[in-house]
């Protein structure tokens, strides 16, 4: 995995700091609001299990990972669900087409590369798929999750950061979170 600078987080999505990847930051209008783990994690896990089965039926060779804050025990979150769908790079476009049959559309105003496509739920559920080419730099979604899962102190610091951003704009929140994410991903 490439470790060029890491930055912004949008709907739980970590993006690289280099200029083309900054486009992956979405534009959201409302101020930040967060929920304690016991207020959202069980429902996100149930929703993840539902989509995991549906994705596996469409893409039996895909790796399917619950990522984002809702996948980290005891983490404060916006209550959204992010799912990484890892596929062979040559099959990414076909995977995107198949996943769209589950009611997902390609996310506009965000990064789109041959190795990454972000899909959002079109029915109003706060669920996103990150369709990622296996072996690409975009597998860092899983790395960030795993680092926090292994370190309760990092989760506590992440929670404190998020709570301190309550009422902030999404832009301000992403800036503050970017520095934290960059530090976490830079740790050995």
Curated annotation (Swiss-Prot):
Transmembrane segments: none
Signal peptide extent: none
InterPro entries the UniProt entry points to: GrpB/CoaE, NT_sf
Top-rank taxon: Bacteria
NCBIfam families: super_attC_Vc_1
Family: Belongs to the UPF0157 (GrpB) family.
Protein name as annotated: UPF0157 protein VC_A0354
Organism this protein belongs to: Vibrio cholerae serotype O1 (strain ATCC 39315 / El Tor Inaba N16961)
Lineage, uppermost ranks: Bacteria, Pseudomonadati, Pseudomonadota, Gammaproteobacteria, Vibrionales
């Amino acid at each position: 995995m490439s470790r060029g600078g890491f930055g912004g987080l949008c709907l739980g999505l970590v993006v690289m700091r280099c200029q083309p990847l900054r486009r992956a930051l979405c534009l959201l209008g409302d101020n930040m609001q967060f929920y304690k783990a016991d207020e959202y994690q069980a429902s996100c896990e149930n929703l993840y299990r539902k989509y995991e089965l549906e994705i596996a039926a469409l893409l039996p060779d895909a790796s399917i990972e619950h990522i984002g804050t809702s996948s980290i025990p005891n983490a404060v979150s916006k209550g959204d669900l992010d799912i990484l769908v890892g596929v062979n790079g040559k099959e990414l476009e076909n995977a995107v087409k198949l996943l769209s049959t589950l009611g997902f559309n390609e996310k506009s105003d965000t990064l789109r590369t041959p190795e990454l496509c972000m899909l959002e739920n079109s029915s109003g559920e706060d669920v996103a798929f990150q369709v990622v080419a296996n072996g690409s730099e975009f597998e860092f979604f899983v790395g960030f999750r795993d680092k926090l899962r292994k370190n309760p102190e990092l989760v506590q610091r992440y929670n404190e950061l998020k709570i301190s951003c309550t009422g902030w704009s999404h832009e301000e929140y992403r800036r503050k979170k970017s520095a934290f994410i960059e530090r976490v991903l830079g740790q050995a």
